[in-house]
């Protein structure tokens, strides 16, 4: 089948590789324009472009997918399928209607759960034990199209977003090719999403990164730290500076007095400082002070002379 793939970040790369290895034709990769990044503000190509060029696949980088020129470029290919994976622009109806078979999307959750931009982060932050990959037919509403195929992925008790991401990009490309093969044979029965089961995974905001110990229980802090690892990272404030928290352990200390406040270091454990939450406490086991490399909780205690009674802001 003639296929147009649309994607931009690292997440899209394994799907490009999978289609290129398959029996289907990958005729064009559509991705976002090169952007200026880094201290030198040099133009950087998106990962999808780098991979496509490495594989000798044509690349198209429209500033907007909504203009007539973009439509004509895609239309000239006469695609059987359009496949998207983290492209970064909403596709207009006339492009969704272009392929002879379908326009399909790879989404990193078990739809209808976690529609939106940050499904892996949100699932881990919420303490879910399972998520997955869904291949869905695209429609006018975000992530609301019919389900064509899916596969579950378990989330371990200590898994981070990074750990789950690795599982998703292992399972997802295989699932995509399986779905493309079935679509070619007309052997897919679309399944409508249950609108009563919908939940959302909005894009992360700066305030999501802040650990408010007065707001979150020890389990919630533990899950948020996992969900924000390796990017963008959870943080609190120590001596007025940002303190990144990369790993914690749930802890229920009985040693603090009733006057201690959430965010207060109430105990010095051999694994790290123990911080009071609105319910229970956590041990900070991997920490990164501002301007420093990440360190163990024990190293933080020794290097910064940490004692009970210090308040994290």
Swiss-Prot record:
Keywords noted in UniProt: Protein biosynthesis, Transferase
A GO MF label: methionyl-tRNA formyltransferase activity
Sites where the protein binds (6S)-5,6,7,8-tetrahydrofolate: 109-112
EC number assigned by the record: 2.1.2.9
Disordered as annotated region, ranges: 32-51
A GO CC annotation given for this chain: cytosol
Catalytic activity: L-methionyl-tRNA(fMet) + (6R)-10-formyltetrahydrofolate = N-formyl-L-methionyl-tRNA(fMet) + (6S)-5,6,7,8-tetrahydrofolate + H(+)
Protein biosynthesis recorded as keyword: yes
UniProt superkingdom: Bacteria
Function: Attaches a formyl group to the free amino group of methionyl-tRNA(fMet). The formyl group appears to play a dual role in the initiator identity of N-formylmethionyl-tRNA by promoting its recognition by IF2 and preventing the misappropriation of this tRNA by the elongation apparatus.
Protein family (similarity comment): Belongs to the Fmt family.
Entries under NCBIfam families matching the protein: fmt (TIGR00460)
Descriptive protein name: Methionyl-tRNA formyltransferase
Protein source organism: Natranaerobius thermophilus (strain ATCC BAA-1301 / DSM 18059 / JW/NM-WN-LF)
Phylogenetic placement of the source organism: Bacteria, Bacillati, Bacillota, Clostridia, Natranaerobiales
């Amino acid at each position: 089948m003639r296929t147009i793939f649309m994607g931009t970040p690292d997440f899209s790369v394994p799907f490009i590789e999978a289609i290129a290895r398959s029996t289907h034709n990958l005729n064009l990769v559509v991705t976002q324009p090169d952007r200026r990044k880094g201290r030198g503000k040099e133009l950087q190509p998106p990962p999808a472009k780098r991979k496509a060029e490495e594989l000798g696949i044509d690349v198209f980088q429209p500033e907007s997918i909504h203009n007539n020129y973009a439509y004509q470029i895609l239309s000239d290919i006469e695609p059987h399928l359009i496949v998207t994976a983290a492209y970064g622009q909403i596709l207009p109806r006339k492009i969704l209607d272009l392929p002879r078979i379908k326009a399909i999307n790879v989404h990193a959750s078990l739809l209808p759960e976690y529609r939106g931009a940050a499904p892996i982060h949100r699932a881990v932050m919420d303490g879910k034990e399972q998520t997955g990959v869904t291949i869905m037919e695209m429609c006018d509403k975000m992530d609301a199209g019919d389900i064509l195929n899916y596969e579950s992925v378990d989330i371990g008790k200590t898994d981070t977003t990074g750990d789950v991401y690795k599982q998703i990009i292992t399972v997802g490309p295989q699932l995509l090719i399986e779905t493309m093969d079935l679509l070619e044979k007309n052997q897919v029965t679309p399944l409508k999403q249950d609108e009563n089961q919908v939940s959302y995974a909005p894009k992360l905001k700066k305030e999501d990164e802040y650990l408010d110990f007065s707001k979150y229980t020890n389990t919630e802090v533990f899950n948020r730290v996992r969900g924000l690892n390796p990017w963008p990272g959870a943080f609190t404030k120590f001596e007025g500076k940002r303190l990144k928290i990369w790993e914690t352990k749930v802890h229920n200390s009985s040693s603090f007095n009733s006057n201690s406040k959430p965010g207060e270091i109430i105990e010095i454990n051999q694994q790290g400082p123990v911080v009071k939450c609105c319910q229970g406490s956590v041990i900070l086991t991997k920490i990164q002070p501002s301007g420093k490399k990440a360190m163990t909780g024990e190293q933080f205690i020794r290097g910064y002379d940490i004692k009970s009674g210090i308040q994290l802001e």
